[in-house]
């Protein structure tokens, strides 16, 4: 039954996109939008499984908590529903991995589809209206993102900030979060073009 419902939703989405004047989200729908997206994630953000999966970030621009029950995302072919208990705090963000893993575990949500070059990510509000969309630019280099800054349009950037504000301070905070404590440190490095012999203790 659930599979049939998803297939029907995908069919209706495809039909809606083929028609002129595709409906936007209703005025009373909470203001949720796609705030950042990376679909060539080679070395930026690992999921709990250690994989560098595609990912996108949703931003709640309203002054209330948004419950994502009834919300879904799609690549135009497959529709993935948010877990009934998923939320975004007011003024906050939620990172979702587009990994084809179709699971929610370890505090992470994974869609049943991945993002590909030339595809479009759709954010679908309850009732089937399209709240937002973002196209995957095939020319975007690896580990670059599309993100909004100061509430503007999605633009290319080298500064990924998943889970943090799309600002210089947010990028610094994201970089800081990736640091790990280790007893091992690099205390010397050199590059030599010629062979050499080691003498003494080493």
Residue ranges: model-predicted function:
Residues 1, 19-20:
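General N-terminal leader/first-domain-start detector
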Residues 1-12:
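Bacterial N-terminal signal peptides that target proteins for export
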């Amino acid at each position: 039954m659930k599979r049939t419902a998803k297939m029907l939703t995908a069919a209706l989405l495809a039909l809606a996109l083929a028609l002129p004047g595709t409906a936007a989200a209703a005025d009373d729908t909470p203001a949720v939008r796609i705030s950042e997206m990376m679909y060539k994630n080679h070395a930026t953000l690992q999921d709990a499984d250690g994989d560098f999966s595609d990912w996108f970030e949703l931003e709640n621009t309203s002054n209330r908590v948004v419950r994502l029950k009834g919300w879904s995302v799609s690549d135009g072919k497959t529709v993935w529903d948010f877990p009934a208990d998923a939320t975004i705090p007011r003024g906050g963000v939620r990172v979702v991995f587009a990994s084809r893993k179709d699971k929610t575990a370890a505090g992470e949500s994974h869609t049943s589809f991945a993002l590909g070059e030339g595809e479009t990510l759709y954010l679908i509000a309850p009732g089937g209206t399209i709240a937002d969309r973002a196209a995957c630019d095939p020319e975007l280099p690896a580990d670059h993102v599309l993100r909004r800054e100061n509430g503007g349009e999605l633009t290319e950037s080298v500064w990924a900030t998943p889970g943090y504000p799309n600002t210089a301070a947010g990028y610094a905070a994201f970089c800081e979060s990736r640091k790990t404590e280790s007893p091992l440190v690099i205390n010397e490095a050199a590059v030599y073009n010629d062979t050499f012999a080691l003498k003494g203790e080493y």
